[in-house]
Amino acid sequence: MTIETSVQRIARLTPLEAILASFQSRIAAVMPRRTPLSQALGAVLAADVQPPECPPRPIALRDGFAVAAAEIAGAGPYAPMPLGLTACRVDVGGALPSGTDAIVPLDAISLRGDRAEAVATVAPGEGVLAAGGDAAPATALRRVGERLRALDLAAMPAAGIAEVTIRSPRLALARATAARTPVLNAAQVTLSRCAVKAGCAVSEASSLAEALSEGQCDALIGIGGTGSGRRDDAVQELARRGRVEAHGIAICPGETAALGFVGERPVLLVPGRLDAALAVWLLIGRHLVAKLAGGKVEDMPTILSLRRKVTSTIGMTEVIPVRCSGGMAEPLGSEYLSLTALTRSDGWILVPAESEGFAAGSEVAVNQWP
């Protein structure tokens, strides 16, 4: 029987907290750059978004007649008052003529031939959006460190914003093996889409060795080859070209993941299994990307009660998929997360390393999948 002496082995599991703490001192934010707003979805702002005054002059918030409110003071159904010489028909969004300060709605106007009369009073400013009412230079629309959302990309052009200053890490993805199995393909596609959603500029290298040798990225994620299989050598390849900080991380799934550096570039090696790759992204990858972008991970969990108990091993940080219904979260698996569990789930919960799990009925924070 042949004994393999060069196989990759995990000597110890590094706590997740230690991995995340190492980011703070070892990883710096990338340089900011200007980019068209339309291309910045998910990116982290490197400067406040300061708008010009918007609108630059008062505009109508409703269809009607622009008037000087004082000229029709006291108008009513039994005391109609003719509109003044400054009155003018305007549509929503139209600029108010000089000398007017309110909009009389059409249902408060009585037309008598070619004469328009107000049958209700309006207060100054009623039906009007003042200059700077949508946005003013003194108030940032979004601040440095915040992530741009789809709503921001829709609203900011209306305030005159065409470009923004962002930090968008260049992230390279590389397979550790030439094999193109469905599961490995799924892991790569998932990580690529997660990274793009997180504001990264993603490229795909032809091989892990090539990606480790080139310096055209800010960070690298290698997929597959982190275990002790006969063809697994991703960690050894990293050791040859850089340094391995940790091989084996106390997370589940994904415990064969590794972290290291080539020069100052961080390298995250994730298992080729879809569930493990996804868990490593959730627990480590997105924090790495957020540090490079000068932002932070922002979860907006929903608090639900656990339908049945969850057990976990002390010392391991665990990702558990859950299905949500009737205000309850039902755990769908642990350790190995099947494709069925992943696709049927509505989100995931985190079991921290210091916990043995949660009892049935416990309140848990359900996070959305990326």
Per-range role (PLM):
Residues F65, A79, A87-C88, D101, ...:
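Structural motif
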Residues M1-R26, L191-G199, S228-G229, D233-R241, ...:
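N-terminal intrinsically disordered, low-complexity, charge/repeat-rich segments that act as generic
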Residues V92, R175-T177, A201, A219-E237, ...:
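Glycine-rich beta-strand-to-loop/alpha-helix junction loops that act as flexible
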Residues R33-S38, A46, A60, A135, ...:
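Flexible glycine/proline-rich
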